[in-house]
């Protein structure tokens, strides 16, 4: 909901006027410019009031306290009552020191009220994903203002929404004052509020830092994960896993549920987004390798050809991706094939085929609920190229021999380094 909205109470005459065929009856005979202006203002007020009365209400943001009580999470539209809920949460948890903001906008009054609370309590603000429109009024009041590497701030002029989808420009003085009081550069504020209300301006991080809107850009391992701030239920966790790893849509549903449960538990225990993503990839890859280890020779040879196609897609310039593919990282193979300029048949069909050839496996500790996220040892590029060459040679051998060699190259356990500590 990337909008600024503001309330205005119109007269009963204005409401009646707007309700009468969109006010056309009131305009009949309106001769002078002053009269037309007055009638237009009355219609605008009536339309916005009717929108507030009869348009479907947007759901307000979810407000929650993170693990340990240090982080407040606000995710969703800044509608009536959001600031009051944050105020109550802060009163009960004075140890909170940071607020995560994920919002496409909402009511100007709520953004201003939330910003006042942030300033009063000396909170740092953090945007992991998107904070637009009214949300920025809260963000800029942070003592320190952190933007995630994937985060974006969006700005535009405020407006009022009419009942029939119209947008009406309004005075931007409150927004201008809020940005000024937060120390935002005047030229930046002017540019932000000059953006049409039906458009959005998302400056790059360098411009935001130069203007004083952001104090630091942070990596996803800096703060607790915020990807489930709007909904941390089981279905939401499952959907987020599939959004990040679509290859798991073809996986064993029970394994997907275990992976999602691990992810959800980590979110609730304060695991960082970076560690969460590493852990998701490791668990997905472990499960998929279990499936392929039990697949027939034809499926294994097809996996080998998919890995070769993936290595060609990433090229020699991407050493990390090449290393992952050469080591049999099924997730990396799938990602490379999905982004190939000329896609070849992707892995989903092979995974479905492998599942049909498998009894439901009992997975070991590597893929179990207690497994910890880990990073594989980096291989030098020369070794990566050598392994790809070995894979190519293996696939030129007779069918049974080729499958055996591909299994050895892609489906053995990779060397591991120290585990990442998981909360």
Where in this protein do the model-derived segments appear?
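Bacterial N-terminal signal peptides
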Residues: 16-25
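STAS-typified acidic loop motif
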Residues: 33, 44-85
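N-terminal Sec/ER secretory leader and immediately downstream segment
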Residues: 67-71, 229-325
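Short, glycine-/small-residue-enriched flexible loop/hinge segments at domain edges that mediate gating
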Residues: 94-110, 124-131
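Charged, glycine-interspersed solvent-exposed loop segments at helix/strand-loop junctions
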Residues: 156-236
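A cross-kingdom marker for long, charged
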Residues: 252, 375-423
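Extended amphipathic alpha-helical interaction segments
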Residues: 312-378
């Amino acid at each position: 909901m990337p909008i600024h909205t503001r309330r205005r109470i119109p007269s009963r005459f204005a409401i009646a006027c707007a309700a009468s065929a969109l006010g056309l009856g009131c305009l009949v005979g309106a001769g002078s410019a002053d009269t037309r202006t007055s009638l237009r203002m009355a219609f605008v007020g009536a339309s916005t009031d009717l929108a507030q009365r009869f348009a479907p209400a947007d759901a307000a943001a979810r407000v929650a306290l993170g693990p340990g009580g240090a982080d407040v999470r606000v995710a969703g539209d800044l509608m009536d009552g959001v600031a009051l809920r944050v105020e109550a949460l802060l009163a009960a948890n004075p140890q909170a020191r940071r607020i995560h903001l994920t919002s496409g906008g909402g009511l100007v009054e709520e953004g201003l009220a939330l910003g006042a609370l942030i300033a009063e309590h000396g909170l740092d603000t953090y945007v992991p994903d998107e904070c637009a429109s009214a949300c920025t009024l809260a963000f800029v009041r942070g003592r320190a203002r952190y933007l995630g590497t994937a985060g974006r701030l969006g700005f535009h002029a405020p407006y009022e929404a009419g009942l029939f989808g119209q947008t009406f420009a309004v005075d931007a003085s409150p927004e201008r004052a809020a940005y000024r009081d937060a120390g935002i550069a005047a030229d930046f504020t002017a540019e932000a509020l000059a953006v049409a209300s039906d458009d959005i301006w998302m400056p790059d991080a360098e411009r935001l830092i130069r203007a004083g809107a952001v104090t630091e850009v942070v990596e996803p391992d800096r703060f607790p994960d915020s990807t489930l701030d709007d909904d941390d239920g089981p279905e939401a966790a499952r959907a987020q896993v599939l959004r990040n790893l679509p290859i798991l849509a073809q996986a064993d549903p029970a394994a997907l549920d275990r992976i999602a449960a691990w992810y959800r538990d980590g979110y609730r225990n304060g695991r960082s987004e970076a560690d969460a993503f590493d852990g998701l990839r490791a668990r997905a890859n472990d499960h998929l390798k279990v499936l392929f280890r039990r697949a027939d020779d034809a499926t294994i040879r097809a996996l080998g050809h998919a890995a070769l196609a993936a290595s060609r897609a990433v090229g020699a310039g991407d050493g990390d991706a090449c290393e992952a593919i050469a080591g049999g990282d099924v997730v990396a193979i799938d990602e490379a094939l999905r982004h190939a300029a000329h896609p070849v048949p992707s892995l989903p069909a092979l995974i479905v085929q492998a599942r049909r050839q498998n009894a439901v496996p009992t997975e070991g500790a590597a893929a179990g609920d207690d497994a910890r996220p880990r990073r594989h040892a980096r291989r030098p590029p020369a070794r990566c190229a050598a392994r790809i060459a070995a894979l190519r040679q293996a696939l030129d051998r007779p069918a049974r021999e080729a499958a055996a060699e591909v299994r050895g190259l892609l489906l053995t356990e990779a060397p591991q380094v120290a585990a990442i500590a998981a909360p």
